[in-house]
Amino acid sequence: KIVNVGVMMKGKGFMDKNMNVGMKDFRPEQMKVERILHEEFPDLEIRLEFPVNNLKIDGHPCAGAVLDIAILGYKVAIRMMGEIHQWSKKSRVKDQYQLYALEEAGWQVIDFIKDEFPAVWNRSKKEVKLNEAKEEVLDRLRKEKVAFL
């Protein structure tokens, strides 16, 4: 079951042009990973842009997080880490802080870093590229020993 929750905001006052037909604005790499997961594991409850609140680090409240992809039931958080996460020191600090908070809340956090998953970020619709992306995703999940494998 796939339930899309939330809209990625692109600035103050942003209104998704697709809202009137119930579509959301998600990044292509995010939708590709979600589609692979749904095709391979149709029984998973997958959410995009899933908010997680009431997080703590060492017992102290901290900011909530919006997960790029959440696999509910197994509490697997997938973060799509594009270029800004690599070159921005602030983003790296925020990401590490968020990682600690999510892990403390019982989430298994898996990062898909752009440079390590070129087929996932590749915009080609060719079957060979889509199969490469599928292998990248499944290899990473096996490496992380996710519970649903």
Listing of model-derived features with the role each one plays in the protein:
Residues 2-149:
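Nucleic-acid endo/exonuclease domains
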